[in-house]
């Protein structure tokens, strides 16, 4: 059965990006199923309005409760997944969160816009996620990378599992450097060890690079990583 994702949004066309590349192939193979639902289709306002002025005054407009609730109710008739809202008050998204959500079978994403949503909408939301301490023009901008990050962990989307098992963050470290042809470009050479064909030495070189890059660039991640005796030797090795 395909992994199902329903996205409630005011701008369905923004998600056409999923029709391309790896995600597009996963959709064609029915590994994942991504549906967009236009919240505007559920408004009872004769002018198709989905927002209104905030009580108490203030700048901007607030997304109305009625079309959000009614669109959620319609989707939940066939999708029993968690309802996830993309907003700045949410828990910061991480690779660990992506792994946990990829274990689900169905998910529902709600994309906010304008100044936000009517606070009463939170009674219908299971989880709020933020991309970080910055503001975007709409939840769609946050939803796209989050959905992509989750879907690429679903078996079959990337092909071989090794494709993501060796990537940054999968084991809590940043990824090692990559090289391809030519072997020498204007004096910039590929490390000789990668041309040696010695798989164990290549593995150790990559792990060493991964450890050292993480320690230098993301000390916060490095502190959380449990070093093995081999890791300690690799960290102290000269290259």
From Swiss-Prot:
Its main location: cytoplasm. GO terms for cellular component: cytosol. GO terms for molecular function: tRNA (guanine(37)-N1)-methyltransferase activity. Pfam families: tRNA_m1G_MT. S-adenosyl-L-methionine binds at residues 112, 131-136. It catalyses: guanosine(37) in tRNA + S-adenosyl-L-methionine = N(1)-methylguanosine(37) in tRNA + S-adenosyl-L-homocysteine + H(+). It is found in: Cytoplasm. Keywords: Cytoplasm, Methyltransferase, S-adenosyl-L-methionine, Transferase, tRNA processing. Specifically methylates guanosine-37 in various tRNAs. HAMAP family: TrmD. This is tRNA (guanine-N(1)-)-methyltransferase.
